[in-house]
Structure formats: C-alpha cells, structure tokens
Amino acid sequence: MKTTISVIKADVGSVAGHAVAHEALKKKCDEILAEARDTGILEDYYITNCGDDIDLIMTHRNGEENEEVHQTAWNAFREATEVARGLKLYGAGQDLLSDTFSGNIKGMGPGCAEMEFKERPSDPVIIFCCDKTEPGAFNLPLFRMFADPFNTAGLVIDPTLHNGYEFEVFDVVEHKKVTMACPDEMYDLLALLGSISRYVIKKIHRRDDGEIAASVSTERLNLMAGKYIGKDDPVAIVRAQSGFPAAGEVVEPFAFPHLVGGWMRGSHNGPLMPVAQRDATPVRFDGPPRVIGLGFQIADCKLVGPIDMFDDPSFDRSRQLASEIAEYMRRHGPFEPHRLPSDEMEYTSLPGVLEKLGDRFEDMD
C-alpha cells in the first residue's frame, strides 16, 4: 500500500502585519486535522508555520488530489479564518480566493505539494516551507540537489543517482508543462529555470525507474486572483538517501542565500535566508524571505520527527551573508534590481501611474 504526503499551506491572518501566524489559528487547524485523523481520512499530520503561512503536513492512503484530504485542509483554513477575524488579525483569510470548496484546493488560493510512493525500508523526507517569496525560489536549490555534482557528490559516485533525474517544469504564465532530463538536457533546462517568475519546477523523478523524488507547490496567487493578494510562499517535499541525494546534500544548496522575488509587497528581490522554525518571523521590510526545513522519517504512513534542519550553527554564516545582502539591496530603495522589473509589477500601482501619465507622454525627436 502506498503512502501519500500532502503539504498544503495558506496565509489566513497574522499578528502585527505579515510577521507570524497566531497560535490560535494553528490550534483551530489542529482540531480539524485531529478529527480527520480520527475518522480515517488522515493517518498522521504535523502543523507548523513559516512567517504568516500555516503549513499543514499530512500523511494518508488516499493518493494525490484526494477530495476528502483537500476538503479537510480547506475546512481548517476556513475555520482558522473565522478565528483570525475575531482577533482582527491582519490579512484574515487573504489566501482563500473562494467562499466554497469545489472538490480540489488547486486554483482556490492555498499552495499544495503532494507525492505518493511505496515506502522504502527507511524513508527520510524533508519538508521545506518559504515565506515572502514565489515558487521559482526552489528552482536553483532543487537543480543543485538533483543535477549539480558540485553540490551532490552522489551524482558522481553513487550508482543509484548516476543516471540522473527528470524535471517536470511548469510555465505558470501559459499554463503548459515540459519534462526534461538531466544531465542530457541540462543547458536547455537551465535556460528555463533561470526565469524564476515564469518557469518553475513542479516535480522531479528518478530516471532509472520514474520514482518520485521531489514535489513543489506552483500556485501563483496574483495570476489566479488578477490582483495583488500576497506572495505565493511555496512549499516543497524532498525525499533523501538511498537512491536520492543524502539529507546533507538536500540542505546544502540553501547555504547560499540566493536572490528571489518577493519580500515587501511581493515586489522586491532579496536573499532567501535559511532559518530555524522559531526564527521564521520576517520583520525587516517584511523579510528578508525565509525558508525552513523540517526532516521526518516516514514509517507506515506516520510522521517520525521532525528535526529542524536549519537549526544548525553551520548555517550561521549563510544567515549573516543573507543579512549583508539584504542591507545592500535595501539601499537601492525603489530602483531595480531591488524592485522587481516592470513586467513583474502588473498588480501594483505601476499600471495606474502609467495610465495617469498617458496623455503626457510625447514622441521623442
């Protein structure tokens, strides 16, 4: 019997702006998920938050895109929204784009990453949760995990990794997808993945047998809503060890705080800072963007753990570097490259400014 992991997240309210989800919201989610576990919909669950996003980590036997599981997550977020409204929290229910559930949570606002697999004798899984950034934030670290031998030594020396992986890439603008193999199509793959606001990794499979290796939430809130709602704040599930990169190879890419889109009002580039869960409270200019990593063992569809993967002094220098990069980027104020390019400002005030100035623009000599 196969095990399914579903990680579904949403921002349904925060204390003092966009800093952190209130504990009362997580408690309400816990009540809903506990009932689902007791009735057999879920086998196990763990609730955490990265900044103002609540992340529901659930295991079950129902496969991906299961209506009952998605309904459970939706109910949890709806109930938490009511609590948020009672506390007058900021952005109560902001990620929920509909009032009624329609059978699948996709397209309704919350982000969702899922994978189904037959458990190995030992099955380590790492769940990554971000705040103040977009799904493309995972492009670079996932590429390094599964295609860069300078990061993942196993690609060179481990026979079970040596034949590489297949990357399923979504074009979130045109709503198309393509699957590309590494190392054969590495350069073509990088040509896409470098455009992190448009091309995003959805899933990664092992080439030898098609076994699932990683899954990412790819929902783009603003594209769904047609206006600025908030940043997408993606989540990812990554399997480790025994045919996949070692746990240390999985977290290693985050030692480099690469630049991602998001931060203040979802309109600025900044470094992705790897932090312990307790430090996932983005405050400076609503950031800089954060990522947490929780490591579990999957045992008969139960979650063993977690271990806080970035609660490690060896990442202290990465955090220091991220702070230095944040300081440098902030000094640019409203100028690029700190502010996103104009084609990424569609849901801000920029279109209105251009419309207001339309009659004042003249042809140049």
Curated annotation (Swiss-Prot):
Listed GO MF terms: fructose 1,6-bisphosphate 1-phosphatase activity; fructose-bisphosphate aldolase activity; magnesium ion binding
Keywords, ordered alphabetically: Carbohydrate metabolism, Gluconeogenesis, Hydrolase, Lyase, Magnesium, Metal-binding, Schiff base
Names of required cofactors: Mg(2+)
Binding site for dihydroxyacetone phosphate: H18, K132, R265, D286
Keyword NADP: no
Binding site for Mg(2+) 2: D52, D53, D131, D233
Quaternary structure, from the entry: Homooctamer; dimer of tetramers.
Function: Catalyzes two subsequent steps in gluconeogenesis: the aldol condensation of dihydroxyacetone phosphate (DHAP) and glyceraldehyde-3-phosphate (GA3P) to fructose-1,6-bisphosphate (FBP), and the dephosphorylation of FBP to fructose-6-phosphate (F6P).
Designated name of the protein: Fructose-1,6-bisphosphate aldolase/phosphatase
Organism of this sequence: Methanothermobacter marburgensis (strain ATCC BAA-927 / DSM 2133 / JCM 14651 / NBRC 100331 / OCM 82 / Marburg) (Methanobacterium thermoautotrophicum)
Gene: fbp
